[in-house]
Each structure stands twice: as C-alpha cells, then as structure tokens.
C-alpha cells in the first residue's frame, strides 16, 4: 500500500474505514477485497436500480467489480475525514455503517500484523483474511477467520480501545 501523505507507514485502519464507508453508501454486501500494487480491487453484490438500500422492490442484485487506485483511496480518506469533522462535534461511532465499522476494526487488526499485502472476503458479516508477511526466513501467507460474532464484539470494544 502506498504511504498516504500524513499517514503512518501502514494505515489499513483508516484506508479500509474509508472504503467501508463507500460500500455503505453504495449498499454493497458480500464483498471481496484484494490489495494490488496501485490500490485495491473490490468485488461485491449491489442492488441496481435502487436508492442504495436492500429492499425487495428496489431493484435487482448485480455483482460489481471496482478498482480503487491510490488517488481514489486518498480522496476517500479526505472525504471521510471531512464528513466526520463536519459540525465540529466528535464523530458518532453509532451512526457509521456496518462496513465502515467492520473494515475499520479489521484494518486496526491488520496494522498490528504488519503485512506486506492483504486479501479478504466477507459473507453474511463473517470475514476470512489472508495476509502476506515477510520475515527473516522468507515470506508466507497467514489466514485468519472472524465470525460475525467476533466482528460485532470487536466493533463493540472499538471505542474503548481507541481511548486506551
């Protein structure tokens, strides 16, 4: 991942949070995200011909594949920060959408692992994550699975973790 101006060396927490907010706005679900040399490739299910929410009369389901280049990610991060800072009040974690929250807490966990690149998919709120890490003995992939209950528990603990 490119180092974004003003960001620490790796800031998957903020990058993934920004992508998650975008997904919430688009009404996507069951997503797959792959890190590429120049950004991210994302695939997910969306409702075409609707207002962005999942409803039976709101359209039909389509699989979309999106490419987010480094410049797109930087713009998402700037827009997300501007949205959160609008009005000057402390952002309300409760108003954030599911993907903004879940991607943020996954990003925080990923930052702690210090991977070289990432891949994950989500289905029904559960995530499978594959990280590529380089050690003195060489590179290797690591898998981790987070159930929907795991993610919800991590989301519930996130505000306290940020204060620590």
Where are the language model's segments positioned?
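Amphipathic, interaction-prone secondary-structure segments
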Residues: 16-51, 103-134
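Intrinsically disordered, low-complexity regulatory segments enriched in Ser/Thr/Pro
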Residues: 1-3, 41-87, 127-164
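Negatively charged, low-complexity tracts enriched in Asp/Glu with abundant Ser/Thr
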Residues: 1-30, 70-113
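Generic low-complexity segments that are intrinsically disordered, proline-rich and/or Lys/Arg-biased
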Residues: 9, 38, 92, 116, ...
């Amino acid at each position: 991942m490119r180092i974004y101006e003003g960001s620490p060396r790796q800031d998957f927490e903020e990058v993934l949070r920004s992508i998650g907010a975008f997904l919430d706005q688009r009404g996507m679900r069951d997503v797959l995200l792959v890190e590429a040399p120049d950004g991210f490739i994302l695939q997910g299910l969306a409702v075409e011909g609707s207002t962005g929410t999942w409803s039976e009369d709101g359209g039909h389901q389509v699989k979309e594949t999106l490419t987010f280049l480094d410049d797109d990610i930087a713009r998402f991060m700037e827009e997300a920060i501007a949205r959160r800072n609008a009005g000057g009040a402390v952002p309300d974690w409760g108003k954030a959408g599911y993907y903004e929250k879940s991607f943020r807490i996954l990003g925080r966990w990923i930052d702690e692992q210090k991977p070289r690149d990432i891949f994950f998919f989500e289905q029904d709120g559960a995530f499978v994550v594959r990280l590529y890490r380089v050690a003195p003995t060489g590179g290797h992939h690591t898998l981790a699975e987070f159930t929907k209950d795991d993610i919800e528990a991590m989301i519930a603990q996130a505000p306290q973790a940020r204060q620590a």
